[in-house]
Regions:
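Conserved interaction-surface patches within small, structured recognition/assembly domains
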Residues: 334-338
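Charged catalytic and DNA/RNA-contacting regions of genome-maintenance
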Residues: 1-331, 344-360, 364-451
Length: 451
């Protein structure tokens, strides 16, 4: 058999590491797919299947999508349950000696997708990790778009099914015992559109799990996190973090706090009751309109909409917490003027949770920074209004709300009010912010004068 061309050999070597993914292989201004990936992707994406010389007698099946419009195609693959590995050129072609080096920089899966084009801003995109043992299961969930990260232990299969229904994750990873459990996996995949996959056994090695948790959360032991008596949660949390590191190729600094909760703190609602009550979607067509959430949702921000949805999906049962929430509601109802003022200030606030994530991951564009700055500007006014309410929740809110004045002042002094979307277009920083930048800008515009 004839040998593959050097480029095709490189493709095969990369693909070998990501057998469960569609490989987007960067060539110039396109992401190209070959062999079985090309056949599959061309059908799903409804694009032309062609061929490419690969060094063998038969041409390799090939299809491709433009680099600048890849999100549209990538999202369609994700919506159809595929994982996509993004393989980029990792060296300057002008400096390359021979074939340009390429490597996978990120794997996009249903539970790790951060595309603004596909995600509902009012709904969390959860990735769930489950470690099931004989008597207990550990459940860990994360929304990498917001940094929300939590874990619990569950004592029965029925309660585990209820927890899955409560979060309705986009993706679940689990061990063999979970995948062999008496759960309705077909319903999860077909009706709930949950992608489910097996986690490699080495992900559940105790020392590896404890090490990755300690490094991610900045602690020396599990006791400091409250996990010393929760081995199942250590396994599910450690496996989840390993999966994120393997797919995102990033330190994920914004995932830095783990919330440990008990399912006994909330009302347990089985899947049938949850559907029949139409809490967040209607029974017939699965739309928000007509559900309890649709009736109650008068929120002004995407963050508030997600929080309200979570409140509805997991009702409180602790009397003190219920009364604290009711006291806050009563205070709002009794002071319509202040309530309406707060709503006016909330209305223009952008999705700060997801903006902070993009900034942390260095995927934000200059206009994201302006959106973040304009939201920060409103925090002192909201905090002043919150101080008017004398209830437990509002007092805690006042104490916890950091105005981040120093960050606002930094953005105000540095970024132009109407910057471009793309960093490479320039014109991001204000004149006078940094002398070195001013010198370079002057050299660009007044170069002839210099000469």
């Amino acid at each position: 058999m004839a040998a593959l061309t050097p480029m095709m050999q490189q493709y095969v070597e990369v693909k070998e590491k990501y057998k469960d993914c569609i490989l987007f292989y960067r060539i110039g201004d396109f992401y190209e797919m070959f062999f079985e990936d090309a056949i599959t992707a061309s059908k799903v994406l409804e694009i032309t299947l062609t061929g490419k010389d690969c060094g063998q007698e038969e041409r390799a099946p090939m299809c491709g999508v433009p680099y600048h419009a890849c999100d549209v195609y990538l999202n369609k693959l994700i919506e159809n349950g595929f994982k996509v590995a993004i393989c980029e050129q990792v060296e300057d072609p002008k400096l390359a000696k021979g074939l340009v080096k390429r490597d996978v920089i990120r794997v996009v899966t249903p539970g790790t997708n951060m595309s603004q084009a596909i995600l509902d801003e009012n709904t969390n995109n959860y990735l769930m990790s489950i470690y099931l043992s004989k008597d207990m299961s550990g459940v860990s969930v994360v929304d990498i778009t917001t940094g929300e990260f939590k874990t619990c232990r569950i004592s029965s299969i029925a309660k585990l099914a209820d927890e899955i229904n409560k979060y309705s994750p986009s993706e679940i990873i689990g061990n063999d015992d979970f995948l062999n459990a008496p759960l309705d996996f077909e319903y999860m995949k077909d009706r709930q559109k949950i992608a489910i996959s097996k986690t490699p056994e080495h992900y559940f090695n105790q020392s590896i799990c404890e090490d990755v948790i300690s490094r991610q959360l900045g602690t020396n032991n599990m006791a400091g996190l409250g996990l010393s008596d929760m081995p199942e949660s250590i396994y599910s949390t450690g496996a989840l973090l390993q999966y994120l590191h393997e797919t995102q190729k990033n330190s994920l600094e914004h995932i830095n706090k783990l919330e440990i909760y008990s399912i006994d703190d909330y009302m347990i609602i089985d899947s049938s009751t949850r559907r029949n009550l139409e809490l967040t979607e209607t029974l017939r067509d699965k739309n928000k309109k007509g559900s309890l959430l649709w009736v109650l949702d008068k929120t002004k921000t995407a963050m508030g909409a997600r929080l309200l949805k979570n409140y509805i999906e997991q009702p409180l049962i602790m009397e003190d917490e219920i009364n604290n929430r009711l006291d806050a509601i009563e205070a709002f109802n009794n002071d319509v003027i202040t309530r309406d003022e707060i709503r006016e200030y909330l209305n223009p606030i952008y999705d700060m949770e997801r903006l902070m994530t993009r900034i942390s991951l260095r995927t934000a564009n200059p206009r994201d920074l302006i959106a973040f700055k304009s939201s920060l500007k409103l925090l002192p006014f909201i905090k002043r209004l919150v101080a008017a309410f004398d209830t437990t929740l509002f007092k805690k809110m006042y104490e916890d709300l950091d105005e981040l004045t120093d960050l606002y002042e930094l953005l105000e002094s540095s970024i132009n009010e109407d910057p471009p979307i793309l960093i490479r277009e320039g014109g991001i920083f204000k004149d006078g912010y940094l002398n070195d930048i001013d010198v370079l800008k002057n050299a660009k515009t007044d170069g002839k004068t210099w000469l």
